Amino acid sequence: MSRKNRAPKREVLADPLYNSKIVTRLINRVMLDGKRGTAATIVYDAFEQIKEATGNDALEVFETAMDNIMPVLEVRARRVGGSNYQVPVEVRPERRITLGLRWLVNASRARGEHTMKERLAKEIMDAANNTGAAVKKREDTHKMAEANRAFAHFRW
């Protein structure tokens, strides 16, 4: 690991179809072994399925789903006087998106549908309806933060 300053964040380009940076980040998150074309096909096909199933704009459904998945609070381990405390802290905006996308893709991969595009589409639709594994992950994270509220004064 470099001892110099932190590596600068690179700007993500908006995807050509929806002109959205968050869709590009979703494609990057779905991508395996550098196969961006395959990942883009999966995401765009999933968005087509969402549009057919709901009749609404797929990007709006996806943004609703992301709002339902992104956490507001999380716990971080903090060592105080020889013992570790799970201290609840607010999640920075950039990290909220990162966690939301990570949980969405992981929940999609864990589903039982036949293809990844089906799994991703169903998970996004579930998340838009406030159900599904990704939303449950957020609820669990919030519950953990609420349970450890007593240690909030250890915040840094």
UniProtKB/Swiss-Prot annotation:
Record key words, sorted: Ribonucleoprotein, Ribosomal protein, RNA-binding, rRNA-binding, tRNA-binding
Gene3D superfamilies per record: Ribosomal protein S7 domain
Alphabetized Pfam families for the sequence: Ribosomal_S7 (PF00177)
Lineage top rank: taxon: Bacteria
GO biological process: translation
GO molecular function, one term: structural constituent of ribosome
InterPro entries on file: Ribosomal_uS7, Ribosomal_uS7_bac/org-type, Ribosomal_uS7_CS, Ribosomal_uS7_dom, Ribosomal_uS7_dom_sf
Protein's name in the database: Small ribosomal subunit protein uS7
Source organism per UniProt: Streptococcus thermophilus (strain ATCC BAA-250 / LMG 18311)
Gene assigned in the entry: rpsG
